[in-house]
């Protein structure tokens, strides 16, 4: 048995920048296959999106480039040489032996940290079709069994348990949990439903993707 935030001793830990890079590559592969693999510039924009990212980051090309080379050396990313520009793709599914459903859930947890089953079900809609929440739970349990994800018991004021990946620094995971605002509070404070917030975030993300393609 592992403690709440332990990861497998034989799995390499990923830092916050590497986690954001891999999450962004997984997302864009699913939502923008016509522009995937991504150029370095497009990947930086994807990493620094202000929607569908928790927390929002402000990474430089140098930081992303250095992290990509580290990820490549460990089998998590690959450089694809092109006639116009070099591009990058992830190898998370190969490195961790994940099926498509597990890859999408892992990518979402990379991008947004701890989430409820319903949040994962809603946010995965553009990337993978789960029939219901039970399918999400099934895949999460398979990840937990391999010590690639962890269940976070609901905190005071929360209605549901949350799940997150187990490939980062446990201290970082603890910090994210402590700082993360309860999504239900977001909606209650503004008078807007969580579903409406998710819809607006998806629209903004689509516009940011179009901008990234225009700037390539």
Swiss-Prot record:
It comes from the Bacteria. InterPro entries: DUF480, WH-like_DNA-bd_sf, WH_DNA-bd_sf. Coiled coil: none annotated. SUPFAM superfamilies: Winged helix' DNA-binding domain. Pfam families: DUF480. Belongs to the UPF0502 family. HAMAP family: UPF0502. This is UPF0502 protein Pfl01_3711. It comes from Pseudomonas fluorescens (strain Pf0-1). The lineage of its organism: Bacteria, Pseudomonadati, Pseudomonadota, Gammaproteobacteria, Pseudomonadales.
